[in-house]
Each structure stands twice: as structure tokens, then as C-alpha cells.
């Protein structure tokens, strides 16, 4: 199995929310507090998930993400491509500490082609600590520390050029 990440081709430069390079219409997307899947569904007939990588990884395999999560354990890694009407719109990378995968949340390792947002936003046990916004080359990105029943997971999303984020 490859150890390459779907997001590692160009590093993400994390920015301040009030950075002058952030257009208001893009910031509106990046600061979305609800389900990005639901928002994308407003711009297409169907959303589809293509799994890229799903496996457990160790702390040593993390980049700067390790400072955002609990240390000293394994993490469930899920990397996907989200498509709207079969056009790639988003690269997603989810890191879930093994200690988060308890009770009903164990099913997070079995999502397969189900959008993460469908699971996360189906109940009221989700909170968000923060959203960081950034750029990866000419693509916009965001990273959120979410808590599911108080337990952390880190979600990084990179918006691809055909995404409605860039439509004016």
C-alpha cells in the first residue's frame, strides 16, 4: 500500500481568516459550519465519494496534524475524492484517534462511499473547535477540529478547481 497522502503534492499554507487574499465568496464556503456535503448537493444532481485510502496509521506517519490531536496512539485515516455529478470537487482527509472510535462511532471505519457529513450531521452530538483556512497552490483549503460526543477528529478539505467554491 502506498504511504502517499492524497494531499501531499503541495503543502497547505494556513492563513488568518482576515487575510486580504481571501475573497468574501470563498470565505463564505471555507467558514461553512454545516455539512459541506449538503452544501455541494445544492449545486449538482448527485454527490459521490471515491475512497482513496482507508487504514490505521501511527503517530509517526502524521505531519503537522499531530499537534492537533491526542498523541501516543493509532489513528483511522480516510482520504477521499468527493465528486459532484462525477466531477471531482474536493479532496478530503479525516484523521480519527482510535479512542474516538468507541460505541456507535466505531462505524466511522466502515463509511466506504458514504459521505462523512452524512454521518457527522445526522445527530446532535457534533461540535467544532475551529476552522483554519489555507491555500494549496491556487486551491483553497480548510481544516476543522471536530468533536463527536466530545471526542476529537481532524478533517482537512481541499477544494478542487471545478468546485462551485470558485464559481461566481
UniProtKB/Swiss-Prot annotation:
Keyword entries, A-Z: Cytoplasm, Lyase, Pyruvate, Ubiquinone biosynthesis
Major subcellular location class: cytoplasm
InterPro entries in UniProt: Chorismate--pyruvate_lyase, Chorismate_lyase_/UTRA_dom_sf
Cited SUPFAM superfamilies: Chorismate lyase-like (SSF64288)
Binding-site residues, substrate: 36, 78, 116, 157
Domain of life: Bacteria
Pathway: Cofactor biosynthesis; ubiquinone biosynthesis
The name this protein goes by in its record: Chorismate pyruvate-lyase
Oligomer status and interactors: Monomer.
Catalytic activity, as annotated: chorismate = 4-hydroxybenzoate + pyruvate
Keyword Lyase listed: yes
GO molecular function, one term: chorismate lyase activity
